[in-house]
Amino acid sequence: YYENSIVVPGPETELLAKAAKDAGAWLSIGVSERDALTATLYNTNLFFSPEGEIIVHRKLKPTGSERVVWGDADKNYFPVAETPWGPMGSMICWESYMPLARAALYQKGITLYISPNTNDNDEWQSTIKHIAIEGHCYFINCDMYFTRDTYPADLQAQDEIAKLPEKVCRGGSCIVDPYGHYLTEPVWDKEAVIYAELDMSKVAASRMEFDVCGHYARPDVLKLVVEDK
């Protein structure tokens, strides 16, 4: 993991920033990040703007055995990118199961919720629909498709790899609108590029009924405090 983790910013991010600039597009990608001064690694999602600006989100709390590899996020919690379509933020995998972490993004007015993850099950599909409705935002579900043959042949522990199912992670990438409806159905058991046109007026329309951090909130009763650094 250490040898394949990248320093941010670094040569790899320069290439990605150039790609975003050349395409005139926003880019979101997950990486294993290495601190430039220490040996600590982070499970990280990066945003690149069309101007090449980098926005870094480190996973707040690694899940289960991930803690053997990655550390806790230590700064700049819950960053959002200001896009022409509203604030865009990300939660990595099971971060989305943390209600207060979701609320921290909702408080920033997030309209585009990006989630890189490896949750290839029906329960996760229920979760992302709930979040799209709860935050009245578009949920971009980026789910890994990964087979046993994807592992490099020279990787150690081949005996353990041989015991894995042929399809280690079945995918399930999809896009959900602010009402919890699929704009693109989950893609299972294959690689694919998914895309959709997003009607951003749905965000405002849906929030007229339920605005989780606005008119449907009770800040005099319930309050979230984020100890950011």
Annotate each predicted stretch with a short phrase:
Residues 144-229:
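C-terminal beta-strand edge segments of enzyme domains
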Residues 5-14, 18, 25, 34-111, ...:
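Active-site catalytic loop in hydrolytic enzyme cores
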Residues 92, 117, 141-144, 197:
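Active-site proximal loops enriched in glycine and acidic residues that flank catalytic Cys/His/Asp
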Residues 133-140, 146-147:
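Acidic, glycine-rich loop-and-strand cores that form catalytic or ligand-binding grooves
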Residues 22-23, 135:
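Helix C-cap/helix->beta junction micro-motif
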Residues 29-31, 44-47, 79, 141, ...:
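Short beta-strand scaffold segments in enzyme catalytic cores
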Residues 1-14, 161-168:
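A short acidic, glycine-rich active-site loop
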Residues 27-29, 55-56, 139-142:
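General beta-strand structural signal in soluble alpha/beta enzymes
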